[in-house]
Amino acid sequence: MPISRERFAQGLTAQEFIDKMTKNQERFQENLEKTTAIFTDEDRVFFAEHPVSIAAIGEDWCTDVIQFLPVGIKLAEAFDLPLRIFLRDENLDLIDQYLKEGKYRSIPVFVLYDSDWNELGYFTERPDSVTQDMAKESRRFALENSDLEGVNRAYENMPDETRAKIRENSSRFRWDNMLEWNRRCVDELKQIAASATAGATR
């Protein structure tokens, strides 16, 4: 069943989500502070003309949520857009409507609605271009660190030390590119919102 206005109203506010966090709070707050800088005057005009409501699904243990949920939160804050957040593991009926590739409960999810509560579309996990960048970096790291034991094996079959080095590199690469990738997230949300008309209900 789609997220009704009534169900939407039962979601967490951004502050309520933050207050419930038990993991990754410091990184999340840092991302919130930095994300404000990615918005433009063009974004302000766009969302004035295409106001939307945003339902987000996430969990604090997920790295993609820690990176991209702050984008949705700051977008809503900057442009006065209604936003509610639902914990994935407590709302499986919701996440199961937005499965990645029809089978994965990937998060975050952003679902956008117009003023008449028509669903305009949704964003899942991360921009495809970011996934491509991450895969390219993984290949580069494996090639330049071929001396690491098992570096070309499936991740779950790698020795612990190799997995640790890969995680360290992936984390560095992600946060080095955070603002650019967050900007791509904004652009994808704008593409979804483009079919909305003025006059969204607050």
Regions found by a protein language model. Give the residues of each.
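Non-globular targeting/processing and membrane-anchoring segments
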Residues: 1-52, 77-82, 88, 96-106, ...
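Short amphipathic alpha-helical surface micro-motifs
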Residues: 37, 65-67, 93-94
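Structural microenvironment flanking redox-active thiols in thiol-disulfide oxidoreductases
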Residues: 60, 90-95
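Local sequence-structure signature of Cys/Sec-based thiol-disulfide redox active-site neighborhoods
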Residues: 43-74
